[in-house]
A protein has these predicted regions:
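Structural motif
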Residues: 12, 20, 79, 95, ...
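Rossmann-fold dinucleotide-binding core
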Residues: 119-189, 198
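NAD(P)-dependent Rossmann-like dehydrogenase/reductase catalytic/cofactor-binding core
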Residues: 1-8, 29-30, 168-171, 178-189, ...
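NAD(P)+-binding Rossmann beta1-loop-alpha1 motif at the extreme N-terminus of oxidoreductases
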Residues: 1-56
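Amphipathic alpha-helical segments at domain termini/boundaries
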Residues: 9, 23-26, 35, 71-91, ...
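Acidic/polar active-site rim loop that often engages polyanionic ligands
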Residues: 30-31, 87, 150-160, 232, ...
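Rossmann-like NAD(P)-binding element
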Residues: 42, 56-59, 63-119, 127
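Structural/interface elements that position substrates and couple domains in central-metabolism enzymes
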Residues: 34, 183-184, 196-206
Length: 298
């Protein structure tokens, strides 16, 4: 199979990343997309989020007509059935919760229901591709395709090769990334966090230490990195936008398994925040609010 043979893509997960990936695939790639989520409510929320972004950032700014937006939205449909989502897919793109047992369960279902030629990809930012692939009968077509958040602005895509992933599939996913106007970098899967998040993990830990030590507020730390280092978003702004604080807490056991207890453990400030309900993302409150409402008063 070649890139030109990919016509229909299933996106599994309609949250912050899944809906952005669906938008990119339809808007930039021109693909037919079936977006799966667990309930009718979350399916609608994910598709509505795409429409809201297109309207706000393109139609209302004169960068896109309403007819063009309607065409993009017309290529995206939603479902609560995994079998329905993947049955005609040439590529399955998983963007669900960052827990290994959840991903293994999903990939077993993809393997059973997707066409024999379909490539099975995951948007994981850290999980081992070889371990995910081992639950399928087609490990040679299981691959990581990690988009960075926000998907529309960030050019980087990490293409993550499992031990048994074929070179042909790696090339095809790199070609797809380029078609979507992204810059692919190929890496091996035995680095937990791959390239970006392994480096970012160390930086984030230091930034969180500075907040805990009251060196500066999260807002000011972000300001230094955005203005001083020309980052589009600071680490705290990014965590609040994506809801990553909750994800880090959920995936702590996997991180410890890969990194060991010292490097893999959750930062205590994240643990305190998440326990108090400050997870960011669609839940609204993250570390900015936690600082303003709680930590700055300690």
């Amino acid at each position: 199979m070649e890139l030109k043979d990919i016509k229909t893509i299933a996106v599994i997960g309609g949250g912050t990343m899944g809906s952005q990936i669906s938008e990119l695939l339809s808007y930039v790639g021109g693909y037919n997309v079936t977006q799966w989520s667990r309930s009718d409510e979350t399916v609608k929320r994910g598709i509505d989020a795409i429409a809201d972004r297109l309207k706000k950032f393109y139609v209302e700014k004169g960068k896109m007509t309403q007819d063009e937006m309607n065409q993009i939205m017309g290529r995206i449909k939603g479902t609560t059935s995994i079998e329905e989502a993947v049955k005609n897919a040439d590529l399955v793109m998983e963007s669900a919760l960052e827990k290994m047992d959840i991903k293994k369960d999903l990939f077993q279902k993809f393997d059973a229901a997707a066409p024999a030629h379909a490539i099975l990809a995951t948007n994981t930012s850290q999980m081992n591709i070889t371990e995910i692939a081992a639950v399928t009968k087609r490990p040679q077509v299981v691959i990581g395709m990690h988009f960075f958040n926000p998907v529309s602005r960030m050019k980087m895509v990490e293409v993550v090769k499992g031990t048994l992933t074929s070179d042909a599939v790696v090339k095809m996913i790199c070609d797809l990334a380029k078609k979507l106007d992204k810059e692919p970098v190929v890496c091996k899967d035995f680095s937990y966090g791959f390239i970006g998040n392994r480096v970012y993990r160390a930086l984030r830990w230091e930034a969180l230490d500075m907040v805990r030590e009251r060196v500066a507020s999260p807002q000011d730390i972000d300001k230094v990195l955005k203005i001083g280092f020309n980052w589009p978003m600071g680490p705290f702004e990014l965590g609040d936008f994506s809801g990553a604080w909750g994800t880090y807490a959920i995936s702590e056991a996997d991180a410890i398994k890969e990194f060991g207890p010292e490097k893999g453990k959750l930062h205590p400030l994240i643990r305190t925040m998440v326990r108090a309900g400050y997870t960011g993302g669609r839940h609204g409150k993250g570390i900015y609010a936690f600082w303003d409402e709680v930590a700055s008063k300690w």
